[in-house]
Amino acid sequence: MSAFLYLASDHPLPERPNPHLRTLSVREALDLGMEVPDFLLEPEVDQDAPDTILWSDLELHIDPDAPLPTGLGPDDDFAVWPMEEKLLDMQTEKPYCACVEWGQYSPGRGRLLLEYLREQMQHTRELEFWHIWLDGALDHPLRQAVIPLTELTVEDISELAQVDFSQEPPTDYCFRIIR
């Protein structure tokens, strides 16, 4: 069970990769001088297979006494990934969906997501921004708001991104953004 942010549209949503993450083959990692776990150096492992190692240029500091990593990191540390298939829990009827992925919300990430949404609204009359609870239940109550793009703010994105799912029953939230 977890919270999940996604966008839905009648127009394909382009990928917005996280500029701090890169996937590498074992050989690429070795060429960069990275330490690679021994099991990846075994003869049966294809050294040229893509997407074997996830590399980040950010250093994560983990405090074992803190519930979440401390520090928000750079504003551009987020991604939008088009989804090939909808998850069962998704209530949208729109054909194109994309996952919004960030460790935690920050105003800078909200601002960059707002820019992305504005760009996408050039191709469609309506876009949905969802925050749902993934638990396999298909009967969550839905709270929905319609917001004209000209009125959508970083504060609106913050409100949706930071929804508290600790209340029972879990509620799914959707902003329908219109032109």
Model region roles, listed by residue range:
Residues M1-R179:
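Structured alpha/beta or helical-core interaction and ligand-binding surfaces enriched in interleaved
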